[in-house]
């Protein structure tokens, strides 16, 4: 059985296993559904965010604290937490998950994302929010769904970096991420 997230489906092996035309038709429909699920997951990563308890606690502290620090070990989800929270606030509305106890924004937001250098912001934060920098096919594979990205503007002098992202907020307005 192939992993649902594997990029390849061995169609020949599946067709060989199908003994009748009806079996093949059922299998072809299932393959098409798997492709649709993959496409939805690829461009809606925010829906797949399943935070650890420390991340839930971090997001919840936003109700009382305007400034927070998430300090944790390497590869534990700090970037994912920040990207998710930034995306959720930029999107608003029903993008706030049921477990969310932090601050909610009914109107579009303005957010600033920073890092050690423009290159590190591009390679880490921008990728987490938008998808792989410089790959047009990857636009929308980060935490902000493709269909909600209104426009991005390039940052002069830094290849594949953006200076601003405009996101359609649930209220109908535009959120800005700098």
Residue ranges and their predicted role:
Residues 1-178:
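Phosphate/NTP-binding elements of NTP-utilizing enzymes
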């Amino acid at each position: 059985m192939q992993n649902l997230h594997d990029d390849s489906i061995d169609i020949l092996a599946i067709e060989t296993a199908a003994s009748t035309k009806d079996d093949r038709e059922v299998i072809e429909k299932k393959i098409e559904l798997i492709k649709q699920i993959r496409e939805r997951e690829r461009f809606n990563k925010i829906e797949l965010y399943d935070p650890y308890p420390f991340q839930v606690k971090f997001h919840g502290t936003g109700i009382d604290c305007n400034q927070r620090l998430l300090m944790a070990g390497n590869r534990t989800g700090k970037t994912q937490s920040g990207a998710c929270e930034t995306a959720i606030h930029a999107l608003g509305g029903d993008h706030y998950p049921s477990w969310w106890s932090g601050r909610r924004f009914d109107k579009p937001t303005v957010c600033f994302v920073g890092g050690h250098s423009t290159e590190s912001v591009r390679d880490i934060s921008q990728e987490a929010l938008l998808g792989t920098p410089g790959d047009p096919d990857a636009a929308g594979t980060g935490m902000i769904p493709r269909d909600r990205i209104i426009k991005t503007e390039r940052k002069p002098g830094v290849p594949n970096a953006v200076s601003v992202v405009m996101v359609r907020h649930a209220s109908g307005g535009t959120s800005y991420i700098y």
